[in-house]
Structure formats: structure tokens, C-alpha cells
Amino acid sequence: MYTVKENVSKEAIEEFLQSRKLTLDVPYQFSLGLFENSRLQGVLLYEDSLWESKVLQKKVMNVKLLAANSTGQLKRLFEAFYTVRQMDETDFIFVRVPAEDIGAAHVIQQQPSSYFVGSLLKLAMPPSFYDKTPPFFELGPPEPGDTEAICELARDSFTKSRYFQDPHLSRDAANEIFQEWTRNNLNGRAAVNIVAKHNGEVIGYLQGLSRDDECILDLMAVKPGFEGKRIAFHLLANLIEQPETQKHRTVTAGTQLHNVRAIRLYERMGFTAEQSYYYYHIWPGKEAK
């Protein structure tokens, strides 16, 4: 007899994940557990994505981790979660599935109005230093007057991302996500903001986060017309060589599996692939495809 319960204890979740040889590398807000005779058989960790909800004017949920001892149990757990999301009028659910978890991917693909919206490759490396010639542009922290130019550069710079692949999100909505994401980072979310300027013009930017012993490349963009001029290399090298970054154990970056240019840059700079994921958006209120 299966039962689904909310608010599973942190200790029970950690014990279950250890039994599955899984690690939790992201924070979460809520938990849902599938139990059989009082034994935990599966967990679903999720959060209200308040920031996305505000920008898109939609109710958005992010599933941070989904795991069970069998595909059947995982399906039972996710369908219980999905039913509640239908009742509380959630607009869309974002689910990240490890690429090797074929069972989980199959369960998500079977849901009504489920859309594959991309894939992510996570790469990592220890902090290091680089031999490099001085760039033809200036690098440094942004000035207050740079904000709008940086946010405008975010427009159409991330078209390979999941938001642009969702048929229920307009191009303008996807662009607004990244412009407000960039602005939020400039307003204090990011631990590091770096801007590249040429003759006073913003031609690139990078934003990095700090989480425990990990420095995370969050956003990076180069102005059209300046690609192939090593701007991204110098931005990333500048981040990695920051004194605060050097205190971290690893530097991580993520990009879409089909973003070959970005992957080649990261590999040339010493990053190695660590994990890959499939991304899905599910719209509980939409009609089935």
C-alpha cells in the first residue's frame, strides 16, 4: 500500500539519496515522499519559483530532484504531484532530469503538455591562472550607468536556453526573463559582476555566484559583432582569477549540449564535463498535445 506524504524529514531524504548513491547539489523548499509500509521509496523536491512567476505573471514550480527505487514508483509519485498542481492552477512546472535516468525522462515525457526544452552540460574545474596577452578592451566592475546597456545586451543573447524552446512562451517573455535575471544579479544577487568595454561601449558581461565551496558562472554574453575576439575567454579568466574565486574548491559552468562554441571554450580553459541533464516544461492547465 503506497501513501504520499508532504514535508519528509531532511534526515530521511538524505538517507534515501545515499541509498541511491545520489547527491543533492541544489536547495529546495518543499518535499513529497512516496512511502510503502512506512518505508520511503521515492522523493520529489521542489520550490515555488517566485521570481519567474513575477516576471512571467504565471504560477511556476521548479522540481529540483526526482528519484525513486523503480520507474513505477517514480511515476506514481510524480502523478500525485501533478494532480495537486492541476488543482492549485500551476501554470508550468520545470523539471530537470539527469540524462542517464532514462526511466525518469520517460515518465516526464508521458505527462500531458510536457515539452522537451533543452539539455544542460555542467562542467567544472579547480581555480587556476592563465597565460594571456592583454585584451584590446577594458575589464572591470560595472558602473551604475552601465545597467541598462548590460540588460539590453541580454536581449537575444540566450536563445539556446529552455525559455526560447517552449511553445507557450513568447520570444519577448523569454528575453524579459534574461534581462530581469541580469538586472537582479547587478542589484546584488551575483557575487561577481564583470563588464567588458571598448571605447566606453559595453561589449560583454559576466555574472558569477558563490555557493559554499563552488563559484558558479551564472550568465555571460558578448555583443553581436564582437564574437570570436576572445572576449568570453578574458571575462571567464577574470572571474576565475578573482581572489574570492581562488578561495573556492571548484568553478562550474553550465551550457546547452548543442552550444558547441561554449563547450569548446570551457574545455580549452580546463573545464571537464561533470553531469548532463534534460530539461522539460510541463503545463498542467494546457490541453494534451
From Swiss-Prot:
The pathway that the record names for this protein is: Spore coat biogenesis; spore coat polysaccharide biosynthesis
Q: Please tell me whether the keyword rRNA processing is annotated for this protein.
A: no
Q: E.C. number, please?
A: 2.3.1.-
SUPFAM superfamilies, from UniProt? Acyl-CoA N-acyltransferases (Nat) (SSF55729)
Top-level EC class as recorded in UniProt = transferase
Q: Which domain of life is it from?
A: Bacteria
Would the keyword ATP-binding be found if you checked this record's keyword annotation? no
Which parts pass through the membrane?
A: none
Q: Which PROSITE patterns match?
A: GNAT
Where is each N-acetyltransferase domain found?
137-289
Which keywords appear in this protein's UniProt record, sorted alphabetically? Acyltransferase, Transferase
**What Pfam families does UniProt report for this protein, alphabetically?**
Acetyltransf_1 (PF00583)
UniProt cross-references to Gene3D superfamilies, sorted A to Z: 3.40.630.30
Query: Under the GO molecular function aspect, what terms does this record hold?
Result: acyltransferase activity, transferring groups other than amino-acyl groups
Name the chain's protein.
Spore coat polysaccharide biosynthesis protein SpsD
What's the source species for this entry? Answer: Bacillus subtilis (strain 168)
What gene codes for this chain? Answer: spsD
